[in-house]
Amino acid sequence: MNIIEIKQLNRYFGEGENRVHVLKDISLSIERGDFVAIMGQSGSGKSTLMNIIGCLDTATGGSSKIDGKETIELTNDQLSDLRSQKFGFIFQRYNLLSSLTAAENVALPAIYAGMPQSQRLERAKQLLEKLGLGDKWQNKPNQLSGGQQQRVSIARALMNGGEIILADEPTGALDSHSGENVMEILRQLHEEGHTIIMVTHDKHIAASANRIIEIKDGEIISDTQKRQVKSAVKNPSVFKGRFGFSKDQLMEAFRMSVSAIVAHKMRSLLTMLGIIIGITSVVSVVALGNGSQQKILENIRGIGTNTMTIFNGNGFGDRRSRHIQNLKISDANTLSKQSYIQSVTPNTSSSGILVVGNKSFTSANLYGIGEQYFDVEGLKLKQGRLLTEDDVDQSNQVVVLDESAKKAIFANENPLGKTVIFNKRPFRVIGVVSDQQLGGFPGNSLNLYSPYSTVLNKITGGSRIGSITVKISDDVNSTVAEKSLTELLKSLHGKKDFFIMNSDTIKQTIENTTGTMKLLISSIAFISLIVGGIGVMNIMLVSVTERTKEIGVRMAIGARQINILQQFLIEAVLICLIGGVAGILLSVLIGVLFNSFITDFSMDFSTASIVTAVLFSTLIGVLFGYMPAKKAAELNPITALAQE
């Protein structure tokens, strides 16, 4: 029964005037279990014929059938499956992968055939034992002689059963003794039922075959049958696996990717550098933005949450506002009666000289406030008492200090009951409160708080106030409250001669602004990620070029295009992923150092930014690794195997 049937087979190379007719109307059939030698000089077309038989190449025209299946119209993946199921290749130069042990080289075809991992190594060891290399299964190719390497190559050809063994000049790189050993193995495989097709130019080697086909200039010039094929041929054991994607194939691709990265440590590190810098920049910028945003929002909360301050004029940029003094104490009293307002305080202030004993302070601020001011602004009592309604009604000359003023004036002394003189007016200290955060950071002035009635009557004179601060009830929407408050004051004044600063609006504005800045700076930092991705693509293209022969070997033993694609894609993703993790760790280290030396605010790392960084580095690997991986997967097996 014929296992191979070829009819009117032609193969051309090149186009136009450079077109070469390599095989010319070749017709032949090979019986199952036969031992055939194809002879011819270099350039005769014998290797091209063997490549077409072995599904490494396709004919330009004609028919080539393996076990009755036409191969001319098969897809690349179908040809890969056929090579994995039917063929075992023995190459003149062995074509073993230098990074793998003898057993791993032998087991390689079984990965693409889908053989379970538990069986692969055991079968590889058995084959090596059969070929006299049982004690060499852990050796790398460079630790083996030429004859031993060729025996490993033969074992690899038998891994999936090797029903058809294709041997291309199997003794060409060996001495006579090793060559004779290889031929003895081939004769034994023939006895076991394997169909052997051997390409050689040596008549002595060809004499071992049952049949000798001689080719010259792409044509068969002789076909000599020396011995008949035995009528009862034992079929060799062939592994019937699943010829598709599997977990083992993925793990093999992952392992080979790691090996490739480790084999070129410095190159891999330099390739990762762009990714490391990009990820470090993005994560650090986001952490800085988060930290500064949290600090500013914390300071706003220190000024007072859900509060609004009403000022004279049309805005902070209104030059006429200093001359407009339309806010009155009666406005504050009216506002205090509204159901949506929790607390109200009129505000006025004066700057002057503070004298305490024999010490004088020139940067002192005296704030005239209502008794509800501390509730509105969220200031906590630290010592003594706060202002009361009686203090306001009676214009008592009492003051409450903030902590900074207390430390500057009295140091470690108890300030309660002590007298301070502001602009030649004596005031008795009754309490100490927490510092108020103004403008986002504490100021350098000494802050004293006194009843607004006292400041108006005894310091500034007049009845007009600078501002009114209200605290909105927690269950009221601040935007709705602001509209109601605006309409009320407009009705009281007859016009809108004031403006309102809403702490919630400021908070939202700051969040939006810092978010925009983070996005802008992150976008700039993202450019370095793109540059790093281009570097990864360049290195992967170099890697494909360096490992072209390896790709050809994998394809010859049954690897599909998807297997090659995933191997190089995983390598690119690994480089970017490792670079991304390194970038995150470097950013965290920078954050630790930053937080150790900077006390105003800290770098705040978020889980979202770290996860996003990891995903982005992976995405960069996929995007920039795809083109080199696709190039590797689309290589022609013959071209790849011919690469030195």
Curated annotation (Swiss-Prot):
For this protein, the Enzyme Commission number is 7.6.2.-
Which keywords does this Swiss-Prot/TrEMBL entry list? Antibiotic resistance, ATP-binding, Cell inner membrane, Cell membrane, Membrane, Nucleotide-binding, Translocase, Transmembrane, Transmembrane helix, Transport
One GO biological process term: response to antibiotic
- One GO molecular-function annotation for this sequence? ATP hydrolysis activity
What does UniProt give as GO cellular component? plasma membrane
The record ties this protein, via Pfam families, to: ABC_tran, FtsX, MacB_PCD
Subcellular location field:
Cell inner membrane
Residue ranges in the Cytoplasmic topological domain are 1-268, 545-573, 629-644
Q: Where does the record place the ABC transporter domain?
A: 4-242
Note the InterPro entries from the entry. Answer: AAA+_ATPase, ABC3_permease_C, ABC_transporter-like_ATP-bd, ABC_transporter-like_CS, MacB-like_ATP-bd, MacB_PCD, Macrolide_Exporter_MacB, P-loop_NTPase
- Major location (coarse): membrane
Keyword flag Repeat: no
How does the protein associate with the membrane? Multi-pass membrane protein
The entry describes its oligomerization and partners as: Homodimer. Part of the tripartite efflux system MacAB-TdeA, which is composed of an inner membrane transporter, MacB, a periplasmic membrane fusion protein, MacA, and an outer membrane component, TdeA. The complex forms a large protein conduit and can translocate molecules across both the inner and outer membranes. Interacts with MacA.
Which PANTHER family does the entry mention?
MACROLIDE EXPORT ATP-BINDING_PERMEASE PROTEIN MACB, MEMBRANE COMPONENT OF TRANSPORTER-RELATED
Function comment: Part of the tripartite efflux system MacAB-TdeA. MacB is a non-canonical ABC transporter that contains transmembrane domains (TMD), which form a pore in the inner membrane, and an ATP-binding domain (NBD), which is responsible for energy generation. Confers resistance against macrolides.
Query: Can you say what this protein is called?
Result: Macrolide export ATP-binding/permease protein MacB
